[in-house]
From Swiss-Prot:
Keywords: Ribonucleoprotein, Ribosomal protein, RNA-binding, rRNA-binding. Pfam families: Ribosomal_S19 (PF00203). The keyword Ribosomal protein applies. Protein S19 forms a complex with S13 that binds strongly to the 16S ribosomal RNA. GO terms for molecular function: rRNA binding; structural constituent of ribosome. Belongs to the universal ribosomal protein uS19 family. This is Small ribosomal subunit protein uS19.
Length: 92
């Protein structure tokens, strides 16, 4: 179930202020954020936002197709290292 239209999309206040400040200054430097739950808005297009994945910040370049999605969707938190292989010559 999605968020109520009456409430509007969630975006962290600090992130919104940083994006708006960069838009007024015509600056496109990387913005670091821990807010994975923030929704991508049209005013973020063209910005690079470094989203925290629990260990490091992963840079995400915002495009038009990402609008409406959450920042956390583009910064995976788990690494898949493959299934464990059976030992050679092991008896079952």
């Amino acid at each position: 179930m999605g968020r109520s239209l009456k409430k509007g999309p969630f975006i962290a206040d600090s992130l919104l202020k940083k994006v708006e400040k960069q838009n007024t200054d015509n600056d496109k430097s990387v913005i670091k954020t821990w807010s994975r739950a923030s929704t991508i808005l049209p005013l973020m297009i063209g910005h690079t936002i470094a989203v925290h994945n629990g260990k490091t910040h992963i840079p995400v370049f915002i495009t038009e197709q990402m609008i409406g999605h959450k920042l956390g969707e583009f910064a995976p938190t788990r690494t898949y290292r493959g299934h464990i292989r059976d030992k050679k010559g092991a008896k079952s």
